[in-house]
Amino acid sequence: MSVKPAGRAIPQKVENAVGAEIEWLVDRHDGAPNFEMRKFTIKSGGSIPKHYHPDIEHEQFVLKGRYKVGIGQKVYEVREGDSIYIPAGAPHWYENSNNEDAEFLCIVPKKEKYDSVYTEAESGLASS
C-alpha cells in the first residue's frame, strides 16, 4: 500500500513533445503489481507527436481542460470528465490549441520497458 502526498511526483518532460510533462503517480516503486498511473500535462500550445506502443494499451481520464487526441484515423475533441481507451499498437497523438493547460490520467500495464515508436520521420524511436 502506498499514499503519495500531492506534489511528490516530479514532473518530467515528455520525450519528443512540446510543452508536455509526465508525472509517475503510482508505479513499480510503490509496489503496484499490474498497472502504473501517470498524470500528463499539456500546456496551452503543446503537443505530443504521433506514436504507438506495440504492446501497451492506455486507459485515460481527462482531469482538466480541452484538447484534441488522434487515435488511428479519427480525431476527438476531449474535455474534463471524458474517458479514453487506446488499444495497444494504435497510433495516437495529442494537441492542445486552447488557452488553458490540459491534464489527464493515464493508466498502463506495468512493463519493464515502455517502447514508444514515433511515426513522424524526425522523431525516430524512443522509450518512455
Annotated model-derived regions:
Residues 26, 49-54, 95-97, 117:
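Short histidine-centered beta-strand/loop micro-motifs
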Residues 39, 85, 100-116:
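A short hydrophobic beta-strand segment most commonly corresponding to one strand
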Residues 50-51, 69-70, 86, 92-99:
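Short beta-strand His + acidic residue motifs that chelate non-heme Fe in jelly-roll/DSBH
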Residues 23, 38-53, 88:
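Conserved short histidine dyad/triad with adjacent acidic residue
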Residues 73-88:
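Short acidic-glycine-tyrosine-enriched beta hairpin
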Residues 17-20, 26, 37, 49, ...:
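Anionic, Ser/Thr-rich low-complexity intrinsically disordered regions
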Residues 55-67, 72:
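Glycine- and acidic-residue-biased ligand/ion/polar-headgroup-sensing regions
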Residues 1-34, 117-128:
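A short, N-terminal "cap"/entry segment at the start of jelly-roll beta-barrel domains
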